[in-house]
Amino acid sequence: MRIVWYPEAAKRLRQVVSYIQTEYGSKSCAKFLKEAYRTERLLARNPCLGPVEPFLADAPVQYRSVVVNRLNKIVYWIDGDAIEIVDFWDTRREPQKQAQQTIDSLKS
């Protein structure tokens, strides 16, 4: 399946990459990117890999999430032959707030 990154998800990924690069250096940044792209490849082969995201259960489509590492997860939904990555969450933050931000960003 093909992977489509929504602009907000790509923006959040870039923010995380920038933070890791600044705070922890190139080696840590490369390791994180390797984990993120590995997760993306796994999703392409196994679209239902992630469980249904409970904080988005009332949404009009079935959102799923998959953990990239212990601090981040990808939020996505399956649209025909495409996996639509709609957000990139920090697992340390309030999940209800992130869910609302995801819904709000999809409305605009």
Task: Please tell me what each predicted stretch does.
Residues 2-63, 105-108:
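Basic, Lys/Arg-enriched alpha-helical interface segments
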Residues 68-108:
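Enriched for short, Lys/Arg-rich terminal
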